[in-house]
C-alpha cells in the first residue's frame, strides 16, 4: 500500500550554537534539527548540494523522507521549515519533524488511470485531459498510498471525473473541502468542429 519513501542522508552535528553552524556551512553542509516523536532534538548536517537538489525538485515540504543518520535508527520525517539567506535565497538551515506511524500528514499522491480500453469516449477518439496529476491528501504516516486510481470503464465523451468519484484508500481525506475536478474526456477536434458547425447552422 505504502509507496517507496525516499532516503535522506544526514550526519550528527557535533557542537551547538552559531559557531558550529557556521563551520558546517564552510564545509559544504547545511545545519539542521530533527525534533518531535517523543525524543530529544537531534542536531544534524545535510550536504548542501543534496538539499539544494531536493528543493529544486519541488514540494520538499510535502514529501515524507526516511532520514538516515549514522549511529541512529532510521526515522520517518517531514520538513517543517527551510531558512534561506535573505540576499542569495539559498538554504541556511533546515528543520525536520519526526513522525509516528499514527501521525496525520498532508502529502501529494499521484493519480493513475486504468481501463483506457474500456472507455467508449476514448474509443471514439476522445482525449483524456488530466487536470490534477497529483492530489493533496491527509494520510496516516504508517499507511501512505503509492497512488490513487481512476477507473475509466464506461466513461463517455464529455464525462468529468471529480474527487468524489474516486474510491480513496481508507483513512485518506482530501485537503480541499470541495468536489474538485481530476480529469475529463474531451471530444476530438473533428467532432468539436462538426458540433460547432451544426450549432451555427441552427442559429
UniProtKB/Swiss-Prot annotation:
Any one GO BP annotation for this protein: translation
Any GO CC annotation of this UniProt entry: cytosolic large ribosomal subunit
GO MF annotations in UniProt: 5S rRNA binding; structural constituent of ribosome
InterPro entries per record: Rbsml_bL25/Gln-tRNA_synth_N (IPR020056), Ribosomal_bL25/Gln-tRNA_synth (IPR011035), Ribosomal_bL25_b-dom (IPR020057), Ribosomal_bL25_C (IPR037121), Ribosomal_bL25_long (IPR001021), Ribosomal_L25_dom (IPR029751), Ribosomal_uL5_bac-type (IPR020930)
Keyword Protein transport attributed: no
Alphabetic keyword roster: Ribonucleoprotein, Ribosomal protein, RNA-binding, rRNA-binding
The keyword rRNA-binding is assigned to this record: yes
Pfam families: Ribosomal_L25p (PF01386), Ribosomal_TL5_C (PF14693)
Assembly information from the UniProt record: Part of the 50S ribosomal subunit; part of the 5S rRNA/L5/L18/L25 subcomplex. Contacts the 5S rRNA. Binds to the 5S rRNA independently of L5 and L18.
Task performed by this protein: This is one of the proteins that binds to the 5S RNA in the ribosome where it forms part of the central protuberance.
Record-stated family: Belongs to the bacterial ribosomal protein bL25 family. CTC subfamily.
Protein's UniProt name: Large ribosomal subunit protein bL25
Organism whose genome encodes this protein: Cereibacter sphaeroides (strain ATCC 17025 / ATH 2.4.3)
Organism taxonomic ancestry: Bacteria, Pseudomonadati, Pseudomonadota, Alphaproteobacteria, Rhodobacterales
